[in-house]
Amino acid sequence: MSDPDSELPEEPNVDPPQEEPKRIVIPSILHSFYEDRPFVSCTRCGESLRDFSEGFRISKSFKGDEVIIESAMCMPCMAAMMEETSDESKQKLEKFHEKHHREVSGFDECALCECTLDEVRDTEFNLVGVCQGDDMLDSAMICFDCQEAMNEIISEETRRTWDRFREENFPGVPADFEPLPSRPAPLLP
C-alpha cells in the first residue's frame, strides 16, 4: 500500500509574507521651530530634502522646552561632514559608540546611556530623526552628558570644522555660542 502523502507534490519553500514596516510620519517635534513647518531644504547645501532617496537627518538641540539650534541635512552632506572629520575623531567616536550605543529607538531614553527624557526634560538634550520623504525611519534622544562626552573626545581640527559649519549655516548665532558646550563657558567679569 502506498502512502497517500507521498503522491502529493512538494510545497515550495515560501517565506511567510513580510509585514510592511509601520509608517511613522515625521512628528511635529522634528519640524522646524523657526519656520513653523516641516523642514524643506538641507541646511548645508540648500537642496530639497525630498530629492534625496537616501533620506536626511534632522537634529534639534533643546534647553528645556526651548529650541536652541536645529538643522536638517541630506545624507550626502552628512557623509561629506564625516569626511571632513579628522581620522582621530572618527576613531574615537567609533569607539565611544561601540562602548555606549544601546539598542533603543525613539525619544524616551538616551541612545547612549539609561537617562530618560523625563530626567533631562528641564536641562539640555538633542533629538535626532533619520527621515525619508514624510516618514521617520529611526529616532534617538541624546542627553547633554553623552553629547558633552562626545564633544570632549573630538580633535581640535574637527572642532574647527564643526565651528565653521555653524558659522556658515547659522549666521545669527553668536560666535561664542555653544548649544552643547565642548569647552567651559568664559567667566563673566
Predicted regions and their residues:
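Short, intrinsically disordered terminal segments enriched in charged and Pro/Gly residues
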Residues: 2-34, 83, 87-104, 155-189
